[in-house]
């Protein structure tokens, strides 16, 4: 019964604060930043957004800005991929990465695969 009351109080507090109480746990923030750094440090690909190519450094800066503006809604690395790093919120077009050999990969797939790899690394 105490657990139900605590859960209810936490939910009520989050609503009362307009979502301000919601924030990604530190380990999820770390995973999100690792995904962004994974893109940022790649020299062998380009980031494609709304038909234009960007360097990976530019992509990382853009994704951090988008995360900052939507941050309170993003609680996990998977949500980051799905809601921020997958598609344009303006046009709805999916983001892509172009590898050095010309292969295009949806950014959602690219980051989901990297997240899976990260999850299987020793801590």
Residues covered by each model-derived region:
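Short alpha-helical segments used as structural interaction elements across diverse proteins
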Residues: 2-3, 28
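Compact alpha-helical subdomains of small soluble proteins
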Residues: 50-123
């Amino acid at each position: 019964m105490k657990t139900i009351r605590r859960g209810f109080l936490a939910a009520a507090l989050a609503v009362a604060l307009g979502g301000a109480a919601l924030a990604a746990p530190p380990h999820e923030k770390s995973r999100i930043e690792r995904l962004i750094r994974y893109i940022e440090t790649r020299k062998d690909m380009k980031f494609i957004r709304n038909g234009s190519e960007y360097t990976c450094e530019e992509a990382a800066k853009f994704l951090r800005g988008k995360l900052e503006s939507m941050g309170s809604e993003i609680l996990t690395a998977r949500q980051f991929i799905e809601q921020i790093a997958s598609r344009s919120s303006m046009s709805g077009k999916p983001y892509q990465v172009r590898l050095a050999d010309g292969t295009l990969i949806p950014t959602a797939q690219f980051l989901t695969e990297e997240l899976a790899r990260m999850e299987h690394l020793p801590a």
